[in-house]
Each structure stands twice: as structure tokens, then as C-alpha cells.
Amino acid sequence: MKILVVQNRMGIGDMVIFLPFIEAISKKYNSPVNILVKANSKASEFLDNNKYINNIIILDRDNKSGSHDGLLGSIKLIKDLKKFNFEKVFIFNSSLRFNLISKFSGIKEIYQYPLFTKKNQHIIKTAQNFIKSQLDINVESQPFIQLENKLIDSAKKNFKIDNNEINILLGIGGSGSTKRVPAKKYIEFMEMAIKNYNCKFFLATGKNEEEQVIQKQILQSIHKDRCIPLDQIKLKDTLPIIKNCQIAICNDSSFSHLSAALGVETIVLMTDTPLLYGNYSPKMHPIIPDGETTVTHNTL
């Protein structure tokens, strides 16, 4: 059966959050599904081992300059989707645009959130209610990223990962300045950790200037010989490294979502993002700023 799932939210975190719902649809119909996602979801880089997903189709929308933007872009997207002859589509949004695109693409069975109800939608509860109402399935919010054992073993060998050490992922990056904890906090944690344990630290961050400053400060500390930076490694190649870690301590960043989905116990340092992004998985353990009872946008 040819099934399309539309998940048009931005970023790795949102892509990870929707994995249990994609899996539920695939299992229901005993068939891998195809997903329509944005390029910045990085789905192609970390879902190539996912047995529930067949084709990853990129939705090219880029601030009105993408090939799928506007009226002409919608026509192009219709042509692109028609080639697959999809029988069903599950649309995880309330957009009339995607509803019409699906109809003009020749898809007979269209399942979608109620139209024009985007405001105040809870990212997880809305998806859970949608799958319950359409497929009568209760979906737990516990994403899982699949990796081949040979990749995990290869990373362990190549990076000299020793089970006698405590291997710790430090997700020091973040998409915004208020999401990033200063380097000194990570250094203080490292000092406390090595007092009692033999530790190795894997530094996960992006390549923008502010993130690189944090990494540089850590690599200039007295703990530099215990650190392995991952910023020059492709995202898909970091996954088996993360899988070999016993614990992750991350800002609210893509790596907190990835590590939790890889089954690593993940402490999430929350600042100004809604708390649900740091506690939706049982593998996530959020820490919020002193004096706060919760966090949301603009907490700091």
C-alpha cells in the first residue's frame, strides 16, 4: 500500500517527536510509509535505517523562494506527488493547502487534522488524538531511532570507546543564544564528574560562531584531553557514537532529541523553550532555571 505522511514542521526535534506516529501508521497497514518533510528536518540523515519509512520526499519551502512555495510551487508539488500514486495520506497539520494538494495529486483517502485549527495546537496531544480518532491506536510519546549493530560496533572501535569509562554526550549547541548554557557550566560539571569517575566527553554542536566559541572554551580547559568534538562529523555518523554513550547532557537542541530517541538517558537543560520539548520522552529528564516552576518561550 502506498501511504504518504505529511510532517511539515521545521527542525530535527519535531521530526523526532513524530516518529511514533509514523511508526503507528506503518504498523497499522503493514507497510512502510513515505514522508513529506522539510530539508531542515534532516530526516534523510538519521532515518535511513528506519524500517517504517520508504521514501523521504523533501518539501522545498524556503521563505517564499523554494520550488514548492506559492501557487506555482503547489502545482509542482502536485506533479511531484502524482508520480507516486499514493492511496492514502495522513496530514499532521490543519492546512487547507495540503488538503487541496493531496486531492489534486489523486490521493483518494485523506486523513488530516481538523482544518483551520492551528492556533494553540499541542504538538503531541493533537497528534495522539488524531491517530486515535482515525486508526483507534493509542500512541505513546517515546520516539525510537533504529541503528544497525555494525554501525554501533564500528563507532566504538574507531573512537576507542571503552565500556570501563563513563562516556558522556555534551550537547553544547543550540539554535538560539538563550538556549545555550555557557561553557563554564559544562566545565564545572566535567570537574565534578571526573572526581568520582573516569569520563570521556563527546562535544556535540553546530558550526555557527557562537556555538564554536563554547566548544573552543571547553577545548581550552584542563579537560581538553578527555574531549572529542563531533562538529566535523556528519550527523548520521554521530548517531552510533551517541548510542555508545551512557548519558547525555544537552541544551534544548537537536542532540537532546536524538540522544533520547537512541535510548540514552538525557538530561535536558531547559531555558526558554516550552517544557514539553524536554520531557515528552521517558528518556528525557529536564532541568529548569533556579526560581522557575516551568519554562516557555522568553523565560530568560
Across the structure, where does each feature detected by a protein language model lie?
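Catalytic machinery of carbohydrate-active enzymes
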Residues: 1-300
